């Protein structure tokens, strides 16, 4: 029997990461209102948001593994999701350039068959290049940073402005593949169980 693998996210980057590792997930966007959750601890916040997204979708299906994720970038003790405007993105990039931040991705994996749930957080240190005002304006004008937690896409144009990472590369894109493998193993599965 094949167990459905359901991604509780509309993120094309997360879907692509799963497909790269051989899993072609069923995509179900949770439409969860993130403003309902007000926590100051970044790890608790991303894990709670990931859990809420996964639970919304889990309540809509009868079987399968449901993966919810949420990412935030913390720079100088301030947590950032997606910027709300180009102006906000420019201000953020002015703070980020030549600086470093920590990208947190909460992972919630619900196994409907076993009635089990796991919560984890991937943590990656990101070092940003000292980019010019012109580079910031051009990058923001591309529209890419407005779609991403932390205001950059490592797998896109934003990768040009990241000097180095300490930790999991895929975590910065929105899903830690090594962490997911560990979570699957903890539930008694292997990644190969979900290969297409």
From Swiss-Prot:
Its EC number is 3.6.1.9. It catalyses: a ribonucleoside 5'-triphosphate + H2O = a ribonucleoside 5'-phosphate + diphosphate + H(+); a 2'-deoxyribonucleoside 5'-triphosphate + H2O = a 2'-deoxyribonucleoside 5'-phosphate + diphosphate + H(+). Keywords: Cytoplasm, Hydrolase, Nucleotide metabolism. One of its GO terms (molecular function) is nucleoside triphosphate diphosphatase activity. It comes from the Bacteria. Its cofactor is a divalent metal cation. GO terms for cellular component: cytoplasm. It is found in: Cytoplasm. One of its GO terms (biological process) is nucleotide metabolic process. The active site is at residue 70. Nucleoside triphosphate pyrophosphatase. May have a dual role in cell division arrest and in preventing the incorporation of modified nucleotides into cellular nucleic acids. Belongs to the Maf family. PANTHER family: BIFUNCTIONAL DTTP/UTP PYROPHOSPHATASE/METHYLTRANSFERASE PROTEIN-RELATED, BIFUNCTIONAL DTTP_UTP PYROPHOSPHATASE_METHYLTRANSFERASE PROTEIN-RELATED. This is Nucleoside triphosphate pyrophosphatase.
